[in-house]
Amino acid sequence: MTKKIHIKKNAWIGARVNILPGVTIGENAIIGTGSIVTKDIPDNAVAVGNPAMVVKMIEKK
């Protein structure tokens, strides 16, 4: 059985990003180009790399 990928509201996904099954991309999250997302990314996070790691949290104004 395959697991679904969940992409929440206002998330930005860069070109050539791979997202593994069962992963959730949080609301307002940004995933950098070419990243490989192996685990959940929280709301308001910027994640990049292989594997994708959170490098910054976006502050709400």
Walk through the language-model features, giving the residues of each.
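Left-handed beta-helix
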Residues: 3, 8-9, 14-15, 20-21, ...
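Terminal amphipathic alpha-helical/low-complexity segments used for targeting or macromolecular assembly
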Residues: 52-61
